[in-house]
């Protein structure tokens, strides 16, 4: 019901924007901000049960949720933010493309702010990940940059060094239960 109530929709949109601002404000030297928005994944064509445990739960309000996301997207675009949304691509797909663009084309550092830590395999020497979806704020980077990031952040953010290849290898061997991949 909350997804259909106009007042609660406004509260939701405000919360999304305030949370985004709070996360961005943790970084002293932000040059650009880009947002990525999920689209219905191409993966469903190959595996019908992809994300089944998630989609069966959200299906009653999925259309209402998408309408809210479209309002957030429109607001962000009107304010001049970079917004990436590609039909058939999930947010993770777009984040991977952005990580390549920033690290290999522009040769700039990129911090991805997300609530989804299961994309840690895209981390590289120029790409790090800030997870702001819990009380325990987590930052993921390659081992060579752990000290640098620990000095950058206040102590309320836990900096974790990860080896992206090991994460990728684990997913290939064990599957990804969060996406219902055996």
For each predicted feature, which ranges?
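Extended two-metal-dependent nuclease catalytic cores across DNA- and RNA-processing enzymes
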Residues: 30, 56-182
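Domain-level signal for Mg2+-assisted phosphodiester chemistry and nucleotide/NA-binding surfaces
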Residues: 1-79
């Amino acid at each position: 019901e909350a997804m259909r109530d106009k007042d609660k929709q406004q509260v939701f949109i405000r919360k999304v924007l305030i949370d985004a601002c709070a996360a961005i404000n943790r970084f002293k030297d932000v040059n650009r901000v880009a947002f990525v928005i999920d689209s219905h994944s191409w993966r469903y064509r190959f595996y019908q049960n992809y994300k089944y445990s998630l989609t069966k739960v959200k299906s009653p309000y999925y259309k209402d949720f998408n309408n809210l996301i479209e309002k957030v997207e429109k607001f962000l675009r009107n304010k001049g933010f970079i917004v990436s949304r590609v039909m058939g691509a999930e947010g993770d797909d777009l984040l991977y493309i952005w990580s390549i663009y920033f690290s290999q084309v522009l040769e700039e550092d990129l911090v991805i702010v997300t609530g989804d830590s299961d994309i840690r395999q895209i981390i590289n020497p120029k790409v790090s990940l800030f997870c702001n979806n819990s009380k325990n704020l987590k930052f993921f980077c390659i081992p060579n940059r752990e000290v640098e990031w620990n000095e950058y952040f206040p102590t309320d953010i836990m900096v974790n060094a990860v080896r992206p290849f090991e994460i990728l290898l684990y997913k290939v061997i064990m599957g990804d239960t969060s996406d219902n991949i055996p």
